[in-house]
């Protein structure tokens, strides 16, 4: 009986720890959105954001625009206040291919590790999708996939779980690669700033 009790207690603790982590990430995400909104306000005096916009004409599909916003914190060195370290915490990335709009968000920890990825776009079959990947220090801890079937007006949940299944592995790998790309691009932009 004690063995069953301790097993149940352990399972409940693990579930509780998992939900706390996802809830913590959601809180960090809400904080990042609020901070980004504040920074985007023209009245706000501190604009801790790099913005990159590229525009080009694509043969066969027309105008193409890519916009990436890199939001960061500034941390002063206590020994040398003029020595400021910039820490990326949030990236938005939007682009279009012909008439299709794509949107992505990347949330990073203070140490620059990926914490959350959100992607909304169209798959190879032109179905609208949403991916949400939650991370802890060891890797992915929760995956949520929503998809619009045919001409339904709302996205419906297709998958929710703690692992990346084979069906979503390609999308997951691409999302993680993009998060690393944007972190590297931020580091490059940061090297050009003061």
Question: What is each of the regions a protein language model found here?
Answer:
Residues 83-92, 112-118:
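Short, hydrophobic/aromatic-rich segments at coil-to-beta transitions
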